[in-house]
């Protein structure tokens, strides 16, 4: 599960880096709403090197994966809102169709009790949370609409590696 924690921290850093540039020419700085960019675009955190000198925030290792495949035995999904248990309370990260108010991600085991047990969440605040969603965690994570670490989610000491 250490690889998953490192991946979430890399996601956080990549989002912070991504939001320093206007990638779609609309004059607004925003966070990426996808991990993998559409071909020929820079609308996600990873894109193939197209020779323009603009390096994707996530780098080539993430790009070797196929969308939908497990990474370190986990699935990852970007969330575009947060709930009442999150710092700052409940709100959408979207203003119109731009994710400029924050970001979050959930990661859950591809095969519960085989590739992992714990599920994890991170938001723009950079704090990682964990919870055992149980054998139905795949369904629960896919239904998750917002970053909402209530009391059942525990803070992960990332410096200690879990």
Regions found by a protein language model. Give the residues of each.
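Extracellular/periplasmic head regions of type IV pilus-like filament subunits
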Residues: 6, 13-118, 122, 132-133
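A short, surface-exposed interaction/processing loop segment used at functional sites
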Residues: 118-153
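Short, low-complexity, Pro/Ser/Thr/Gly-rich segments in the mature regions of secreted, periplasmic
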Residues: 151-162
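Membrane-proximal amphipathic alpha-helices
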Residues: 1-8
């Amino acid at each position: 599960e250490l690889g998953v924690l490192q991946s979430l921290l890399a996601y956080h850093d990549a989002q912070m880096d991504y939001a320093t540039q206007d990638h779609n020419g609309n004059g607004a700085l925003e966070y990426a709403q996808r991990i993998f960019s559409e071909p020929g675009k820079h609308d996600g955190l990873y894109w193939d090197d197209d020779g323009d000198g603009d390096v994707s925030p996530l780098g080539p290792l993430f790009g070797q994966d196929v969308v939908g495949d497990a990474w370190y035995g986990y699935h990852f999904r970007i969330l575009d809102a947060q709930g009442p248990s999150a710092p700052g309370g409940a709100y959408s990260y979207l203003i119109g169709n731009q994710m400029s108010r924050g970001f979050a991600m959930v990661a859950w085991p591809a095969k519960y009790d085989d590739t992992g047990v714990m599920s994890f969440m991170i938001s723009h605040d950079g704090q990682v949370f964990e919870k055992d969603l149980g054998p139905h965690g795949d369904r629960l994570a896919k239904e998750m609409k917002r970053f909402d670490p209530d009391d059942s989610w525990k803070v992960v000491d990332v410096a200690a590696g879990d």
